[in-house]
Amino acid sequence: MTVQIITIDGPSGSGKGTLAAKLAAYYQFHLLDSGALYRLLGLSLHKHDLLEKLDSHLDMCVNYARQLNIKFETSAEGTLVFLDGEDVTQTIRTERVGEYASKVAAIPELRQALFERQRAFAQTPGLVADGRDMATSIFPEANAKIYLTASAESRAERRVKQLQGMGLDAKINDILANIQARDKRDMEREVAPLKPAADAYIIDSSELTIDQVFKLMVDYVNSRTVSN
């Protein structure tokens, strides 16, 4: 049986995670949050004092990537994420861990180490994969390819609200600077830079609600022969 795959790529804070989860629930597909994998690897390397030694200890870092002890659990509150048995669901969503992930994602050998782990998520009846290079690198055969973007300013505003909702302090200028720096790093990295696939459906969510974007996505996905 053919596995149907929907990819959602785009920059940090564009709403990929929220909408990927909604699509996966709507179609009853599996869900891959590739950003979580990079955040988990970045957090693990930081805990083992290796994040600042990527060049000198690359082989060791690659081994950590291949053996990463992670688990995803679905609960009434959403998806819980565990690293080495510890619940790190909130931790991996902080700005600091986002910076760890961006550093890790810029290393070709570490991206390759996570490649097969991501491919393994493609199981029947289907998969919704959210990330930066799902359509261009990991699942180029995807049935439906979506590129979700938004202005840096609107993404910063959303991120501040998200962090404040988690009880964390957040300053708009700092968040905006971080987003702009991550965009630059993601778009300019040597391997799998952030960009839409040639055949991607591009949505700018700057002035749209989640429900409006979701409807656009469902209409597009259905037109690509994936049915509910």
UniProtKB/Swiss-Prot annotation:
Q: Which reaction does it catalyse?
A: CMP + ATP = CDP + ADP; dCMP + ATP = dCDP + ADP
Q: What subcellular locations does the record give?
A: Cytoplasm
| EC number(s) recorded for this UniProt protein | 2.7.4.25
Q: Which residues form a coiled coil?
A: none
- Residues that hold ATP according to the record: G10, P11, S12, G13, S14, G15, K16, G17, T18
Q: Which GO terms describe its cellular component?
A: cytosol
Q: Tell me which InterPro entries the record gives.
A: Cytidylate_kin (IPR003136), Cytidylate_kinase_dom (IPR011994), P-loop_NTPase (IPR027417)
Biological process terms from the Gene Ontology for this record are: nucleobase-containing small molecule interconversion; pyrimidine nucleotide metabolic process
Coarse class of the primary localization is cytoplasm
The alphabetized UniProt keywords are: ATP-binding, Cytoplasm, Kinase, Nucleotide-binding, Transferase
Q: Which GO terms describe its molecular function?
A: ATP binding; CMP kinase activity; dCMP kinase activity
Keyword Ribosomal protein carried by entry:
no
Pfam families, sorted: Cytidylate_kin
Membrane-spanning regions, if any? none
> SUPFAM superfamilies in the record, alphabetically?
P-loop containing nucleoside triphosphate hydrolases
Specify the enzyme's EC class, one word: transferase
Q: Which family does it belong to?
A: Belongs to the cytidylate kinase family. Type 1 subfamily.
Q: Which PANTHER family match?
A: CYTIDYLATE KINASE, CYTIDYLATE KINASE/PANTOATE-BETA-ALANINE LIGASE
Name this protein carries in UniProt: Cytidylate kinase
Its source organism is Acinetobacter baumannii (strain AYE)
Organism taxonomic ancestry: Bacteria, Pseudomonadati, Pseudomonadota, Gammaproteobacteria, Moraxellales
